[in-house]
Amino acid sequence: MISENRLSKLRKEKGKYAYSTENRIFAWKNIIWPLLLEVNRPWFTLKEYRTKRDEVSDTNHIPKEKIGKGLISLIFKGLVVKEKENYSIDDNLLPYFKKRIILEYNIAVRETRI
């Protein structure tokens, strides 16, 4: 587990924006996209997200808070859309989901900006 002092030092070294991007990439690559492929639908519930987040957090020894910041950041970026009880992906990403392609973060960002 990374101490708060170490996280603060990382933010200063990399910069605030690089740190946020790192959180988004990690959340997308390790939680959001694999979860969507697992549940086999373009949306997921908060309970499903938390289960996957806890699994990834325990496996990689990363604080849950860091991963949670990644989800929030993905919502602000527009890759993930919050709808009442569920979270879904942007409509422009549906063709990738239907083909069950491993979608990299940079491609997802580019597709949502179109």
Task: Give the location of each predicted region.
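Short alpha-helical segments that sit at the start of domains
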Residues: 2-43
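Short, amphipathic alpha-helical interaction segments positioned at domain boundaries
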Residues: 94-114
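A short, conserved structural fragment
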Residues: 75-85
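Short acidic, hydrophobic short linear motifs in intrinsically disordered regions
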Residues: 41-55
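Short amphipathic alpha-helical interaction segments
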Residues: 59-76
